[in-house]
Design a protein with these regions (language model features):
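Short, cysteine-centered beta-strand-loop-beta hairpins and adjacent loop/turn segments enriched
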Residues: 106, 131-140
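Bacterial N-terminal signal peptides that target proteins for export
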Residues: 2-15
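A solvent-exposed, acidic/Ser-Thr-rich amphipathic alpha-helical stretch
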Residues: 66-118
Length: 185
């Protein structure tokens, strides 16, 4: 009988600890599920806001970046080459990434297809864009953008694209001489 008593004394605290740990895990899982449920409307709002902004851009609108990006956006273009890098603030992003490219286009980039997913504070957009360069040659590219959202705007963005066609437009076509340093067209 003494052996059983020792077994119970060892097993009982072990079982109690496991039950407490299991309860804590279930409690954390329930809290996480409740958090997800409470943020579900915001996740859907972010997804719809980005989708609607893309639709307006596709239809000819030109306010996508000012509409969707926080003034303090941190935008990273992944990859290697002269166009890859991190831009801090919408003014930096506009001056160093948007303006040099857009100034070399006859027709602006327009999304021609898109897919959007949202999870938590992130919205992921996979899209294809087309434009015409000033020399009449077409520009086509596929993009994947990952936005981290706050207050209905992107505060961080990570962009994946084929930089070769982008850099080719910048290398092939000179920037117009009438574009002042602050003009972002």
């Amino acid at each position: 009988m003494r052996g059983h008593s020792l077994t119970y004394r060892v097993k009982l605290p072990l079982v109690g600890a496991l039950l407490l740990a299991g309860g804590a895990t279930l409690s954390n899982a329930n809290a996480s599920a409740m958090e997800t449920e409470s943020s579900a409307p915001e996740v859907e709002r972010n997804k719809q806001a980005v989708g609607a902004a893309f639709d307006r851009w596709s239809a000819g609108g030109s306010n996508f970046f000012s509409e969707m990006l926080s003034p303090d956006i941190v935008w990273t273009i992944e990859g290697s080459g002269p166009s890859a890098g991190t831009f801090r603030g919408i003014a930096d992003f506009t001056a160093r990434a948007i303006k040099p490219f857009v100034s070399r286009l006859r027709e602006p980039v327009r999304p021609v297809s898109k897919r959007i997913w949202a999870d938590g504070e992130h919205v992921i957009i996979h899209w294809e864009g087309e434009a015409v360069a000033r020399d009449g040659k077409p520009y086509r590219n596929r993009y994947a953008w990952i936005f981290r959202m706050a207050g209905g705007r992107a505060i961080e963005a990570t962009a994946f694209l084929d930089l070769a066609p982008y850099d080719d437009v910048i290398r092939r076509i000179p920037e117009p001489s009438n574009m002042g340093a602050g003009d972002a067209r």
